[in-house]
Amino acid sequence: MAGLLKSLPPRATRTADAAAVSRASKTVAATPTIKGGKSVYDRISTIVAVVNTKLGKYADKYDLLRDEKSVYDYFDNIMQYGMGAIDTETDSLDPITCTLAGACLYVPGSKAAYVPMHHVSYVTGVQSANQVPDEVVRECLIKCEEKRVKWVLHNAKYDRRVCWNQLGVQITPWWDTQLAASCLNENESHRLKDLHLKYCDSQDDESLTYDKLFEGIPFTYIPITTGYLYAAGDPIKTWELMEFQQKYLTEEKLPGPYYVFKNIEMPIIPVVAAMEDRGICLDKEFAAELSAKYNEQMKEREARIYDVLDMYKSEIEEYKQSHPNHILSDPIGIGSSKQIAIVLYDILGLTSPDKEKPRGTGEDILLRLDTPISQALLNYRETAKLLSTYVDKMPGILNPKTGKIHCSFHQYGAATGRFSSSDPNMQNIPSHNKEIRKMFRGEPGYVLISSDFSQQEPRTLAHMSKDENMIQAYIDGKDIYAWIAEKIYKVPYEECKEFRPDGTKNPEGKKRRDSVKSIILGIMYGRGAKAIAEQLNCSTKEAQKIVDQFYDSFPKVKKWMDSVLNNARRYGFVETAWGRKRRLPDVQLAPYEFELLSGGPSTFDPLNFDDDQGEAVVDPSVVAKYTKLLDKTWGGRERADVIARAREEGIKITDNGGKIADAERQCVNSIIQGSSADMTKLAMIAIHNDERLKELDCHLLLQVHDEVICECPEANAKEVSERLTSLMIGAAKEKIRVPMKCDAEVTYCWYGDALEV
């Protein structure tokens, strides 16, 4: 893990860290200053004082290993035990460009230890004395790998990447307490100190938050005798947390989460680490072309907004005269939501389609307003976002060492176990705008091969529901959306497809197919008829009719969904095909919670007091009365009136309906999305470990939900694409009886023209 900097707020970027180092290392007459105006000297003096005061009591419990013999001896103890905990301390969150300040170690039978490696004087930048050379730690880690030492870590991917990029050694994680914590409970904080305090009966003073204390100060600047007091405790915490987790994942008989942890989450750590280290190339020339194009487009779209506003020049002037304290600028600030709201609602007299946002100016509201000004604003914002988020941003975040984009992939990015990515978010690159994705390409001489699971989630739905008709359709190679549309709309199968047999477009067929796709995805994502109707641009009644027809055609789907909800209400969780749990405690909430306010009626009897009475509670008859009233209400306004009346009587009522409904919507989706995520991860593990793909110089680069993107030499593209799809399809066979299908495409750039191979 990133040690000192691992838990910093979003400020901790490479750019900010580099700037802090640059400011602190300049030779100036006065002591340099950092964020907040305080000098580095003052900040480090504060850090030393606070750490020594709070953690000085641990000085005798930790070892500071500053000579080679001590380091060799400690690693010998680890190898003899066969296991050990390790943590790295660095000066930034980028494993490629960071400086390795030191390593923290722990093995039972020894004190926790800190090995300083690259601490420097914050004044001169000179390496501090009595530190251990990289070669010594590298040699010891290599020996540990040869002895197959089981390493215990927290956020193992980071430490593996640091050891590889800074020492040239790939350590093999055996237990990652961060991932184990996610498998045990995805709904809580997974910071090491939070978990240790909660589960390991920690006696430490965890009230001290170090993030703010160290903010902006590279750990390499911290004096060694202070730094080790902060750092050396982490591997002990990691070890103790591992022991707790191991007990619950094994002895407490949790086969599902344990299987997911040991067979999916742990094996995929090296896969993700390799993806992040490899990075992806950016076509800087093409990015510059796009920047020029979209900057010109943004000017045109900005001009269009003012052309539309000129149509209402007299109305705008009239508003200004009647509102002498108005905030409208000249010209009107199109980036100001307050000014745009004045134009839309006060000057043009429009009514917001969202009652909860009567003066909203967001994308969803502008879309539904559907006026010339709202459309012009949407077009302008679209271009501005493409420029600021992608086109102009990407060239500025290329890694200075590699010249590539190296994003971070988060294995438990979603509570369902689905990946997410950040810095940058490669999963959020627009798919509808192919130009943006075309900025990313393979290395010179390499091509990109993208392969995605076709209809991964509907196939998973067919398997989980055990609907024979849906399963058979996939076995027969049918387009499931067109096939279901045939059943619902009572028209031939070919009339429900986007293209006719002769290759010509079929608009009506596409409409039928798209409507069914929206329904199936809506069902899987817990959307109601109203939400589906908005997506299909039809009435709620019409959408509900189609949904009912779907359930009539596939009754086992409805039966399975009902059973999922019933089991969730009973047990508080749902489970994927591979055993990953998604805990949804809100499903089990009472519809209403009653709390006695001061002076309210209760069952407490002060004249007949005994200990068994406990705290005062709302009288059951009062609870029954208000529950009956609430159940009879129609809409939120009536319910709010009843709750207000109860409050006047000294009773606070909490309506849990929203929380319950939200949790219920997640039940089916968590199983489908979680199972699909497990499937994709197993496919990635198989691809990464495949010896033939290694021989063909194939490297995983990106993962975007149901799609993986690799690169390989162009000459190997045909065999790689065939091998890739075979491995992906095979990854599902262990648990999913519905045949999976994968479509592979070879291109020079992401979403580029397909190459013949």
Predicted regions and their residues:
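Conserved beta-strand -> loop -> alpha-helix junction used to position metal-binding or nucleic-acid-contacting
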Residues: 169-194, 477-481
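Generic long, charged, amphipathic alpha-helical segments
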Residues: 480-511, 577-703
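Short, low-order "capping/linker" segments at domain edges
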Residues: 750-757
